[in-house]
Design a protein with these regions (language model features):
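Conserved catalytic core of the tyrosine transesterase superfamily
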Residues: 1-188
Length: 188
């Protein structure tokens, strides 16, 4: 199985902070990177987001997903930081309805968002193999580490089965393994 790259190092974290703050590659890149790293949505799910899918007062987004060949609507909680970024983005883009990501020629497609991601990664000096899917993997691993709740990660990512989530995202780093065995039987 091919290893999915994560955004790990301090340098990469700083570059991502720059991307999220809009200092690199403009308003679409800022929102795309922030949304990807804050929600774990697939690029196709981000491209499909509509203005009406975002509820900033209640702090959630509604996502249309394809599960077992059926479309479903999932509601995902979003954090305070992304809520503020969405407010700023919507105001700067003067959005009132329609797609959340719109370019000069109309709604941005998944491929268009991937091009924005790649250009942003390059401008930030990050490794080019960091795909937009890397953001999905990154949030999954961090959310699992923070909460220890596989079911929450499964729901966030929209997986039909917790086994899928566990097989793909329950990474254990060497550092985690060392921390786990060091002092295992020490008196507490």
């Amino acid at each position: 199985m091919k290893e999915v790259k994560q955004l790990r190092t301090v340098t990469e974290a700083r570059a991502i902070t720059d991307l999220k703050a809009g200092r690199i590659n403009g308003v679409h890149a800022w929102m795309l990177v922030d949304l990807a790293l804050s929600t774990g949505l697939r690029v196709s799910e981000i491209a499909a987001l509509q203005f009406k899918d975002v509820d900033l007062k209640r702090g959630y987004i509604s996502v249309t997903r394809l599960k077992r060949k059926k479309k479903t609507k999932d509601t995902l909680a979003i954090g305070k930081d992304i809520i503020q970024h969405l407010k700023d983005y919507i105001a700067s883009m003067e959005l009132k309805r329609g797609p959340l990501f719109v370019g000069s020629r109309g709604p941005l497609t998944a491929q268009g968002l991937q091009r924005i991601w790649k250009r942003s990664i390059k401008l930030a000096g990050l490794p080019k193999e960091l795909s937009i899917h890397s953001a999905r993997h990154t949030i999954a691993v961090h959310l699992l580490k923070k909460t220890g709740n596989l079911r929450q990660v499964q729901k966030q990512l929209g997986h039909a089965s917790p086994a899928t989530t566990a097989n793909m995202y329950a990474d254990i780093s060497f550092e985690d393994m060392q921390n786990g065995v060091n002092g295992l039987y020490d008196q507490q």
